[in-house]
């Protein structure tokens, strides 16, 4: 792969990764600037907290899709190495998007899943499933993201991925952990916010402080 090909694939991946779906969709449908609420990131998890599950689902699919599109272009152009180069560009674009003035984007989790879907499909599916299971079990999106990203490199290796693909996913895992450093600090202090899962048939959200206080003050009736 020539230097020119590397540069072109990296730029193409970056432009695709820069599409800030979380910002655009939440702005269009809710009027909110997702960068001004919650974690201030444009990723799907922050969208879920402040725009609902349907919006989360759409943003997650689009963020996965842009990672897959970048990797697919790289794969078609220069094989697995090209997929890695374009995929890396997509991650950088999601983190510091061109269309938001190179300012803060997302934490690259969904886009990493999208790239992995092309270079290691089975590993990508397992990563996504693991993310969901950890989220349901702990209700911490940060714990789910860190756990799933750490599992990805060995999964890629287990499913027969090449060393460039393993190295790419290892680098992505390190980047994801670094982007969650504030979350890690809050977890260590016990101040990280749990995620309220409001889905049909799944009511694992914690009671509000007022409801909890009311429950604790409730006494049995006098007979």
Predicted segments with their positions:
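Interhelical loop and helix-boundary elements at the membrane-water interface
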Residues: 12, 16, 21-66, 94-110, ...
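Interfacial segments of multi-pass membrane proteins
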Residues: 48-51, 74-78, 89, 93, ...
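Topogenic membrane-insertion module of multi-pass membrane proteins
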Residues: 1-6, 19-22
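Nucleotide and nucleotide-moiety/phosphate-recognizing core
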Residues: 5, 9, 54-100, 119-122, ...
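Alpha-helical transmembrane segments and their immediate juxtamembrane flanks
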Residues: 162-190
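Membrane-interface helix-boundary signature
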Residues: 52-55, 79-83, 141, 162-168
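Loop-to-transmembrane alpha-helix initiation sites
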Residues: 125, 141-149, 160-172
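Alpha-helical transmembrane segments
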Residues: 5-16, 171
């Amino acid at each position: 792969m020539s230097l020119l090909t590397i540069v072109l694939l990296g730029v193409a991946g970056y432009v695709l990764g820069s599409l800030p779906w979380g910002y655009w969709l939440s702005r269009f449908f809710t009027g909110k600037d997702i960068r001004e609420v919650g974690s201030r990131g444009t990723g799907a998890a922050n969208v879920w907290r402040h725009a609902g599950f349907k919006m989360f689902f759409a943003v997650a699919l689009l963020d996965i899709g842009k990672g897959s599109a970048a990797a697919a272009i790289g794969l078609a152009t220069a094989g697995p190495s090209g997929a890695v180069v374009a995929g890396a560009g997509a991650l950088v674009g999601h983190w510091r998007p061109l269309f938001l003035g190179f300012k803060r984007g997302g934490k690259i989790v969904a886009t990493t899943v999208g790239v992995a879907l092309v270079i290691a499909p089975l590993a990508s599916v397992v990563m996504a499933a693991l993310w969901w299971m950890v989220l349901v079990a702990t209700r911490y999106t940060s714990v789910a993201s860190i756990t799933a990203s750490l599992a990805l490199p060995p999964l890629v290796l287990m499913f027969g991925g090449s060393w460039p693909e393993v190295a790419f996913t290892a680098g992505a895992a390190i980047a994801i952990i670094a982007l969650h450093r504030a979350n890690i600090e809050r977890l260590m202090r016990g101040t990280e916010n749990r995620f309220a899962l409001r889905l049909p048939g799944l009511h694992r959200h914690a009671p509000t402080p007022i409801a909890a206080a009311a429950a604790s003050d409730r006494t049995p009736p006098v007979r």
